């Protein structure tokens, strides 16, 4: 039977799910309708749509996982539930993270200005660079799935033992393997994080250089390019902040689950972990002028609809 803490956990998980679905469904529908109307799909719209779809899938897996954790935690000890849920969670999380990373790199190439020949060469082949990164992410996903299979097998073997402390004292080999596999899974997250951090640093350098050139030419320090730099930096910084919270929450959740099992601490750490897919879509909407204008029009129509008087009954 669900306790009060379980009910609070499930309520917060459902709230996160609804918030995330509202933002990502809006992004997907807005970009699809725009593409159908214009008969053309731009690179940024394609990345945003794929990101919205992968995040929706991730949110659905999270919702199912939260209900299992809150209502039937004993199922985590069975291979029938823990393996498909864990693999699906990692797959959708991997795709969401890498698509968000590619979006940050796209904004960097689109907005930053450097005279260096390597930057100009990469910028000219921006779509190809994004395609190569997505292909690399798929190879890393295959590697992740193989490591994850071994991680799940060892975890289930440890859970099957009646006395975990005695088992670890008798043989350190399973624990050492678990630590090694968890480290490998964690290291893969550093690649998209490093790419986003590099994009942010170069965007900042480009902004400083652009502002200095404007001051030297006596044109002031604010123009359309400066504002574009700042908007892009805010988006990448927001993504990095959410990604840091997401990454450290994942590490804490992994350790608490491996050491303490599926307890109340693990459940509430997972809520912080799920803030990334829930909130990131609204950062994207606020940072994209087209999506922001569409959202404002939608809210205006909803406001007028709610204020419209009801017809008198016959």
UniProtKB/Swiss-Prot annotation:
GO terms for cellular component: plasma membrane. Belongs to the G-protein coupled receptor T2R family. The keyword Methyltransferase does not apply. GO terms for molecular function: bitter taste receptor activity; G protein-coupled receptor activity. The gene is TAS2R42. Its main location: membrane. Receptor that may play a role in the perception of bitterness and is gustducin-linked. May play a role in sensing the chemical composition of the gastrointestinal content. The activity of this receptor may stimulate alpha gustducin, mediate PLC-beta-2 activation and lead to the gating of TRPM5. InterPro entries: TAS2R. CDD domains: 7tm_TAS2R42. It is found in: Membrane. The chain crosses the membrane at residues 8-28, 51-71, 102-122, 128-148, 188-208, 239-259, 266-286. Residues 1-7, 72-101, 149-187, 260-265 are extracellular. Residues 29-50, 123-127, 209-238, 287-314 are cytoplasmic. The lineage of its organism: Eukaryota, Metazoa, Chordata, Craniata, Vertebrata. Pfam families: TAS2R. It is a multi-pass membrane protein. The keyword Glycoprotein applies. Keywords: G-protein coupled receptor, Glycoprotein, Membrane, Receptor, Sensory transduction, Taste, Transducer, Transmembrane, Transmembrane helix. Glycans are attached at residue 163. This is Taste receptor type 2 member 42.
